[in-house]
């Protein structure tokens, strides 16, 4: 189970950076509709595009595992 909402995190980071999803898409060499589809995807976006989006926004990704 993912404990945070990565889709919302990407949207918030775009807002904080003053960038649109279209601008992020251009930064990573993909289309705006593709970025939008990935962000809204029901089963999450933890894939290469997710990593590229956060790196384009100036972030490293840290995954924390918590024992249940």
What kind of feature is each model-predicted range?
Residues 10, 21, 32, 47-50:
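Helix-turn-helix DNA-binding elements, focusing on the entry/boundary residues of the two helices
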Residues 65-68:
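Short amphipathic recognition helices of helix-turn-helix/homeodomain-type DNA-binding modules
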Residues 23-25:
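Short alpha-helical "recognition helix" segments of helix-turn-helix
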Residues 16, 27, 56:
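Residues within the alpha-helical elements of helix-turn-helix
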């Amino acid at each position: 189970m993912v404990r945070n909402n990565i889709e919302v995190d990407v949207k918030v980071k775009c807002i904080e950076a003053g960038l649109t999803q279209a601008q992020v898409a251009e930064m990573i060499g993909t289309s705006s509709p593709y970025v939008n589809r990935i962000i809204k995807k029901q089963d999450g976006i933890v894939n290469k595009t997710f990593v590229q989006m956060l790196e384009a926004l100036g972030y490293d990704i840290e995954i924390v595992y918590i024992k249940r």
